[in-house]
């Protein structure tokens, strides 16, 4: 199945977070946090402006980003893999 995001929506795949502490202890449960980094796998056509024009998104497929995981971030399973659907406004930075 293929997802094609609309407007200013971005689809990304969460990057795995290190599950060991600096001292080598395996983190589980509440100590193991979910990563807020992800790789962009699809982008919408752009943000629709009030005058009817479309502003292109700043992120592109392949970018690794840091995002704000909060209200408005939708998690979906597609072909057995978790993907996140969010607005470009929820992206805080591009990792270069």
UniProtKB/Swiss-Prot annotation:
Keywords: Chaperone, Cytoplasm. CDD domains: cpn10. Pfam families: Cpn10. Heptamer of 7 subunits arranged in a ring. Interacts with the chaperonin GroEL. Belongs to the GroES chaperonin family. GO terms for cellular component: cytoplasm. This is Co-chaperonin GroES. It is found in: Cytoplasm. GO terms for biological process: chaperone cofactor-dependent protein refolding. Together with the chaperonin GroEL, plays an essential role in assisting protein folding. The GroEL-GroES system forms a nano-cage that allows encapsulation of the non-native substrate proteins and provides a physical environment optimized to promote and accelerate protein folding. GroES binds to the apical surface of the GroEL ring, thereby capping the opening of the GroEL channel. The lineage of its organism: Bacteria, Pseudomonadati, Pseudomonadota, Gammaproteobacteria, Pasteurellales. GO terms for molecular function: ATP binding; metal ion binding; protein folding chaperone; protein-folding chaperone binding; unfolded protein binding. The keyword Protein transport does not apply.
């Amino acid at each position: 199945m293929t997802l094609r995001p609309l407007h200013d929506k971005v689809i990304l795949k969460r990057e795995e977070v290190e599950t060991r502490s600096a001292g080598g202890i395996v983190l589980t449960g509440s100590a193991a946090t979910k990563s807020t980094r992800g790789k962009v796998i699809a982008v919408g056509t752009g943000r629709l402006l009030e005058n009817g024009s479309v502003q292109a998104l700043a992120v592109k497929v392949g970018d690794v980003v840091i995002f704000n995981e909060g209200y408005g971030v939708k998690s979906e399973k597609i072909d057995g893999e978790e993907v996140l659907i969010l607005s470009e406004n929820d992206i805080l930075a591009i990792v270069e």
